[in-house]
Amino acid sequence: MHPAGLAAAAAGTPRLRKWPSKRRIPVSQPGMADPHQLFDDTSSAQSRGYGAQRAPGGLSYPAASPTPHAAFLADPVSNMAMAYGSSLAAQGKELVDKNIDRFIPITKLKYYFAVDTMYVGRKLGLLFFPYLHQDWEVQYQQDTPVAPRFDVNAPDLYIPAMAFITYVLVAGLALGTQDRFSPDLLGLQASSALAWLTLEVLAILLSLYLVTVNTDLTTIDLVAFLGYKYVGMIGGVLMGLLFGKIGYYLVLGWCCVAIFVFMIRTLRLKILADAAAEGVPVRGARNQLRMYLTMAVAAAQPMLMYWLTFHLVR
């Protein structure tokens, strides 16, 4: 057909235009599974509404966690093994603590390390200047001595332990400056100091037993009081390294007198405590022995201080 005829026919008879039909894909509602899906997709469970509960107002709440009973039922073997292992560990810890306390009083040792910086400073001042101190009584609270950090007169193990370690280090320094250092010699220095301390404690305990002294002075108290002499020994050796023998003898002499006064005033209250409480005169024969014992212990401290340090200064 001619194009002009086609145009005329189109003008005379209007034709309906066909639009392509659009097929709408149904939107799946939350919680509805895809009919073409064989298995549930658990990886996107939270996006489909399984991981949270929705309130009527649109607020979502987190999913409830499984209860311990449900967790136990899920894996009973491992949970029973874990519970059994925890029970064994607790029983073992209790048994070890009980056996350790039988030989080493851990709970009592905690008292002797209950110190702070202020106590250490005041105690060191008391060891170097005991002449300025007036009240030497140990404070008690409900028949129990207060912690050392609250009472400068209470014995502690922190200062003696640190002083002993520092003494060994200073001895190694002194031997090194004299080209005499060796691990064996340093070990001999430490073991000899520890051996003398052990002999002191045993001798005092035996003397207290022979004199039949009823005192609250314990073995740990003796170790604490006898360990304070290492502080003066450190000062003497350091002054000897800096100023020679003159500085050594001056500082060590001062520390020897100070430790003698400190031990007399401290042990006198411990050893003669029962006699003073009973009102027994100090001039009695029994109390005279106690006074001699106190003076002997105090006099032994300067002698040991010199014996353990004189060879370190040249």
From Swiss-Prot:
In-chain residues carrying the UniProt-annotated modification Phosphoserine: S65
Keyword vocabulary terms for this entry: Acetylation, Disease variant, Endoplasmic reticulum, Golgi apparatus, Intellectual disability, Membrane, Phosphoprotein, Protein transport, Transmembrane, Transmembrane helix, Transport
GO CC aspect terms: COPII-coated ER to Golgi transport vesicle; endoplasmic reticulum; endoplasmic reticulum membrane; endoplasmic reticulum-Golgi intermediate compartment; endoplasmic reticulum-Golgi intermediate compartment membrane; Golgi apparatus; Golgi membrane; intracellular membrane-bounded organelle
Compartments in which it is found: Endoplasmic reticulum membrane; Golgi apparatus membrane; Endoplasmic reticulum-Golgi intermediate compartment membrane
Gene Ontology biological process terms from the UniProt entry: endoplasmic reticulum to Golgi vesicle-mediated transport; protein targeting to membrane; protein transport; sperm flagellum assembly
Positions on the Extracellular side per record topology: 178-192, 241, 314
Disease implicated: Kaya-Barakat-Masson syndrome: An autosomal recessive neurodevelopmental disorder characterized by impaired intellectual development, absent speech, hypotonia, profound developmental and motor delay with dystonia, poor coordination and spasticity, and visual deficits with brain MRI evidence of ventricle enlargement, myelination alterations and cerebellar atrophy.
Family, as annotated: Belongs to the YIF1 family.
Protein name (Swiss-Prot/TrEMBL): Protein YIF1B
Protein species of origin: Homo sapiens (Human)
Species classification: Eukaryota, Metazoa, Chordata, Craniata, Vertebrata
